[in-house]
UniProtKB/Swiss-Prot annotation:
Disulfide bonds: none
InterPro entries for the chain: SASP_SspO
Matches recorded under Pfam families: SspO
Protein name: Small, acid-soluble spore protein O
Entry's localization field: Spore core
Position of the signal peptide: none
GO biological process, one term: asexual sporulation
Record organism: Bacillus pumilus (strain SAFR-032)
Gene coding for it: sspO
Coarse class of the protein's main subcellular location: other
Keywords, ordered alphabetically: Sporulation
Ranges in coiled-coil conformation: none
Amino acid sequence: MTKRKANHVINGMNAAKSQGNGAGYIEDDQLVLTAEQRQNNKKRKKNQ
């Protein structure tokens, strides 16, 4: 079996088409973050 690419890596997979453009998760924005900002970008701050 070949290893499948994760869905969040495929471009446009997170876009919410039924809610119109721009309603989905902004994927390209994540690449702009610095290393320090990435540390504070976790979902749950409580567990840090």
